[in-house]
Amino acid sequence: MTMESARSYDVLVLGGGNAALCAALTAREIGRSVLMLEWAPKHSRGGNSRHVRNLRCMHDAPADVLTDSYPEEEYWQDLLKVTGGQTSEELARMTIRATADCRGWMIRHGARFQPALGGTLHVSRTNAFFLGGGKALLNAYYRSAEALGVEIRYDCEVVDLAIDDGRFTSATVIEEGERREIRAKTVVAAAGGFESNLAWLKEAWGPVADNFLIRGTPYNMGRVLRVLIDRGAKSIGDPKQGHSVAIDARAPKFDGGICTRVDCVSLGIVVNADAQRFYDEGEDFWPKRYAIWGRLVAGQPDQIGYSIIDVKSMGRFMPPVFPPVKANSIPELAKALGLDPAALEATVSSFNRAVRPGNFDHTVLDDCGTEGLAPPKTHWARTIDTPPYFAYPLRPGITFTYLGVTVNAKAQVIMNDGKPAPNIFAAGEIMAGNVLGKGYLAGIGMSIGTTFGRIAGEQAARHAAH
């Protein structure tokens, strides 16, 4: 039996992370009644936003924590390159432009920024870092939402949406063990992708998905996404595409967060279970390439890789939470990793012979490359010959998936007939595939969530007023 809520709301926000909060705050600022539903318990609220560190920002001149400039066209070209053109230029440029002035709004709701830390992907020019990280940002937003009168319910799972001819009327939720119906004039879907749904990942990837680790929340099961698609929303994106990085293989199955990411890939070599290299570790700056390495490792035998460096590279990257495997020789390192010692020694020797002299500088695209080696290492190639040697085991770490719902510039969900749903809006991961067809840029997930959260909140509030 489904119990009907006695109250109807102007704006119903599904989700509890950055995009959901931006929508709820914006709608409430306009004066609409807002109910936000978070499936997670209060101590785990916030989705993947708990693990974020920064926001990628367009700016034409130095501004507080941002150095130099990062103009719109450069931002756009960076995005175009990593996505291979699989992006909506209209929505992407809208996102980029919105980042130029969103920080003032964020600060009004309690966000605090700090200069980039050493070793954080060389992004002090392009990214503004949150003081205290994502959890501090979320706590500030929740405080602001509560002060403004946003109603928030935790442990509340959305299991269905009533949508008739593209128009939303109510949501069915499970709360305190009971099915309840909640009515609202508008709805904002900001409940994340399906990255926590192991069965759905396996449906897309096959058996290899068994070896994937989920970097963030276990609550992003894709329930709202699935319901929207089943109710006629037009999908966008490939279910096999997403923000996927190489993380320490010793990380937990869920919620390891950013501290499990391995950032020394571009400083050394990466080998697979056969002790063979399989990709150019120095192709481009790490912020533009770190998010392809999860997918690369996923394509290797047993979905495992090993990032190998020598002592020369220590101290040049932000160390992950787990200590590296350490050895005084390459064969000894191979044994510790369970690799064939002769094979690893041959791979390292071959790499060392191919390294050409240059001026090593990890802050620029330097001239330290290899010659006659397949795959090559284009930049930052230095011989691995100074003990002790170190290694980090790698697994694919899924951050979020790109399969989502299609939206327009008003954040309205587009239905299969090509028409926008008049009162259904989407923000964050659930629609990020409109901007990210593949690839990733550090901090752009927060740019998308913040931009479309605010747009969705404003548009939902204005629709509810009529």
What are these regions (language model features)?
Residues 297-388, 459, 463:
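Helix-rich C-terminal "cap"/substrate-channel and partner-interaction subdomain
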Residues 221, 225-343:
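An anion/pyrophosphate-binding glycine-rich loop and adjacent beta-alpha core
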Residues 160, 343-434, 438:
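A glycine-rich dinucleotide-binding beta-alpha-beta segment and adjacent secondary-structure elements
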Residues 154-167:
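A conserved short coil-to-beta-strand element within the FAD-binding core of flavoproteins
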Residues 5-19, 35:
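Beta1/beta-strand and adjacent pyrophosphate-binding region of the FAD-binding site
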Residues 33, 39-151, 268-277, 282-283, ...:
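Conserved N-terminal/central alpha/beta ligand/cofactor-binding core
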Residues 178, 182-251, 446, 455:
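Glycine-rich loop(s) and the adjacent beta-strand/alpha-helix scaffold that form part
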